[in-house]
Amino acid sequence: MRLLERVIHAYPRAFDLVLADGLYLTAPFFNFLLAPRKHLLVVLKDERRNLYKDAAGMFDFIAPQQGTRGSRDCLWWDFPDLLSWPQVNRAVRVVRSLETWSVRRQLDKRESIQTSDWIWATTLSAAQTSTAWAVGFGHQRWDIENHAFNELVSQWQADHVFKPEPNAMECFLLVAFLAYNIFHAFWALSLKPQAKRGTTQSFWATLICAELHGRAIPGFLSP
């Protein structure tokens, strides 16, 4: 929480929602972020909690809504305004996504049906975020790990130790994170769809590198 406290103090409008694992499903953490009007969406997997028990008790009696997420067929349950967690300073919403999809096995080329069951607790109201968006936010926590950190290692050499000294290693990582965020903000917010068409992120990264080298080294781009 110390890191979040520093971030909120320095950049109070940088974010509105925190995504977290079930480890952070605690009343002090919820209340800490509710105070500066931030929202949370946290994995709910502790079957001993009253919040989980109350939601689970309604799964068999309330029909789910059908939805999709990519190639997956989903059944969604959405229970807003639950008061099963009085230690939290507001009502909590529980969202469940039961997902089914098929995978073709490489060995025998047969299709195998896969399922996954996700439950989240969130402070976002139904008016603020639809069920589909809440499910999408819940899965984005894994996207950060599977895509962002994966890309940082494979494309940005973030796992390479340029100088084996703690402060230097921290600085290199922070600069890598900053460069990664700036580049992806440029890709997502500045480039128009027409400019992206037929190109890749690597193409634009190469152009940016060429521009930076051209400015740093006089005559770099000269014929």
Description of each model-found segment:
Residues A27-N31, Y52-D54:
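A short acidic (Asp/Glu
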Residues M1-F29, P36:
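Conserved, well-structured functional cores that handle cations and Mg-NTP chemistry
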Residues L17-L23, L40, W120, I144-F149, ...:
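Short, conserved catalytic/metal-binding motifs centered on acidic residues
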Residues C74, P80-L83, V153-P223:
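A short, flexible helix-boundary coil/loop motif
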Residues Q128-K163:
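Short amphipathic alpha-helical "interface-anchor" segments enriched in bulky aromatics
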Residues H9, D60, P64, F183-W187, ...:
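Generic secondary-structure signature for well-ordered alpha-helical cores
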Residues W118, A132, N146, M169-A176:
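Non-catalytic, well-ordered alpha-helical scaffold segments
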Residues H39, K45-R141:
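An anionic, glycine-rich sequence signature occurring as long contiguous blocks
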